[in-house]
UniProtKB/Swiss-Prot annotation:
Catalysed reactions, semicolon-separated: L-rhamnulose 1-phosphate = (S)-lactaldehyde + dihydroxyacetone phosphate
Protein name, per record: Rhamnulose-1-phosphate aldolase
Residues the record lists as binding Zn(2+): 139, 141, 210
Pathway terms, separated by semicolons: Carbohydrate degradation; L-rhamnose degradation; glycerone phosphate from L-rhamnose: step 3/3
InterPro entries per UniProt: Aldolase_class_II_sugar_metab, Aldolase_II/adducin_N, Aldolase_II/adducin_N_sf, Rhamnulose-1-P_Aldolase
Lineage of the organism: Bacteria, Bacillati, Bacillota, Bacilli, Bacillales
Function recorded in the entry: Catalyzes the reversible cleavage of L-rhamnulose-1-phosphate to dihydroxyacetone phosphate (DHAP) and L-lactaldehyde.
């Protein structure tokens, strides 16, 4: 076996947690990440049939039976991941019946996987049903989009349209729009179920007054989605409350033209023309 610290997926996780912390989106122990690992990725680094311990999940994860995930730990600080991955991360395997998980590696000084494990696994189930190339769920406390949930209507169509109007690239990056979940108690199966339901048709779920969850085929993909939403929200928060108001923005007609140029289909019900007829 090779050193797991040299595994590309481990190096990428360490880099990503540093990026999130440096952006100010992972204060204290805030934020969590999970990545589905392919057998070909992990076979040279870890014996996936050797378990350190097993714990019940408390929900049915049978669609993920036998799958292995690299997951951030509960109560762990993203800023510490790079200097001590084995204490702050873990690798888990969903049991054959989907009722529990096995710890394969990590959490060397004790602990459990992220308290949002239910949200992560439920969202993985949904996204894999929509996209077999899906791999990553990322949750972080992005500042501007969290602030936006206090002052903007939480209607998903209105929220998405505002973001699309802030930066030209937004419609191209997330034509499937942004889903919004109202404030719910963190770390619960209920929040996981609500988030997963939203991920049937959107890769981005905003948790009102809390943060954002993004799904992607790679770490860069998931991070890029969150990064783009956050930048659009930051622009909105900087301009929306000027006494003059917003004097001009990208129009629906211009967004339709943009979608046609980049061959994307805007989520229905948001724009007044073409792919998003109201």
């Amino acid at each position: 076996m090779y050193s797991i610290y040299e595994a590309p997926f481990m190096k990428e996780m360490c880099e990503m947690t540093q990026n999130l912390w440096r952006n100010g989106w992972a204060e204290k122990n805030g934020g969590n990440i999970s990545q589905l690992l392919e057998a070909s990725e992990i076979k040279h680094y870890l014996d996936t049939d050797r378990y350190l311990w097993t714990e019940p999940l408390g929900f049915d994860a049978s669609p993920l039976a036998g799958n292995v995930f690299l997951v951030s730990g509960s109560g762990k600080y993203f800023k510490n991941v790079q200097k001590n991955p084995a204490d702050n991360l873990c690798i888990i395997k969903v049991s054959s019946d989907g009722a529990s998980y096995h710890l394969l590696w990590g959490l060397e000084n004790g602990g459990r996987p992220t308290s949002e494990l239910a949200s992560h696994l439920k969202c993985h189930i949904v996204r894999l049903s929509q996209d077999p190339d899906h791999r990553v769920i990322l949750h972080t406390h992005a500042t501007a989009v969290s602030a936006m949930t206090f002052v903007h209507d939480l209607d998903e169509a209105k929220f998405t349209r505002t973001l699309w109007q802030m930066i030209t690239e937004c419609l191209v990056v997330f034509p499937d729009g942004v889903a919004v979940v109202p404030w719910m108690v963190a770390g619960t199966n209920e929040l996981g179920e609500a988030s997963a339901a939203k991920m049937n048709d959107s890769r981005i779920v905003v948790w009102a007054h809390h943060g954002i969850m993004g799904a992607g085929t790679t770490m860069d993909d998931a991070f890029g989605l969150v990064e783009t939403v956050e930048k659009a929200a930051k622009i909105y928060m900087q301009i929306a409350h000027f006494p003059t108001g917003i004097k001009q923005a990208i129009t629906d007609e211009e967004l339709v033209a943009l979608a046609e140029r980049f061959n994307v289909v805007p989520k229905a019900g948001i724009l007044k023309e073409a792919g998003g007829v109201k």
